[in-house]
Amino acid sequence: LPQWDPSQEEPDTYNLPDMQLTVSKFISDIMATIKSQEDAKSYDFLTGLPMRNLGERLTAEFMQTHDGCLVFLDMDNLKKINDIYGHKAGDRALKCLGKLLQKRADQGISCRLGGDEFLMFLSDTDPDSLSLQMDDLFQKFHNITTDDPELRFATLSAGLCLCSTDDSFEDCYSKADKALYYVKQNGKNQFFFYQQIDRSTLAASGSGKDLKLVAESLQKSGILSLIHI
């Protein structure tokens, strides 16, 4: 019978170390793809900013070690733009604002909460410096919208709350939201610090709005011919 001669055996075409590297790279590529897809779900495709869940988490974590200012930012009249010029115009306005906020990444964190609402945390506690930053943001957005006839109704409103590391994210969020509400009820297209508004003023602002809505409803129904608010 013929004897097996190892020297005559064809060389192994499979190199185990190379195969291990190939498998390792394949798995690495798969994991990178999955992570990329997960990251994509956390970012708004229009503005490129983190969406609510990621943005709020990053902001809350950052606030634990940094004093600063939480800003609740709202784009005014987005619905009006969508209704008159279509959603492409509204999306264009959102993209413009997103780009402006991305350019300020060195100043803090920004995210899109949804719709026309955005959240920012600026690592600055000086009201004068913060006011200059907000003025600059408002002016740059105004310059963009005035150059585009379809975006001429778009303006910004913002509520600001000065925060320290001792403050909770939830408390500052609520205060910034109240400051934004005050702005919305007093003409829009401006910003206010929560610390500038006392509780009685905030309460009066809300009550006044409610009374005005009731009066308008009564006038339309014909129950009252004239009501002065």
Give a label for each model feature:
Residues G206-H228:
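Active-site core of bacterial EAL-family cyclic-dinucleotide phosphodiesterase domains
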Residues D39-S42, M51-C69, D76-K103, C111-G115, ...:
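Conserved long alpha-helical elements within nucleotide-processing catalytic cores of c-di-GMP signaling
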Residues R112-L113, Q139-S157, K184, K188:
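Catalytic core regions of nucleotide second-messenger enzymes
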Residues D12-M19, V23-F26, G90, L130, ...:
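The cytosolic transmitter module of two-component sensor histidine kinases
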Residues D5-F45, R52-D67:
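Signal-transducing coiled-coil linker helices
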Residues E61, L100, K140-N143, Y182, ...:
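Amphipathic alpha-helical regulatory segments at dimerization interfaces
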Residues S110, S157-T165, D171-N186, F192-G206, ...:
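Cyclic nucleotide signaling catalytic output domains
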Residues G68, G108, L156, N189, ...:
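PAS-family sensory domain
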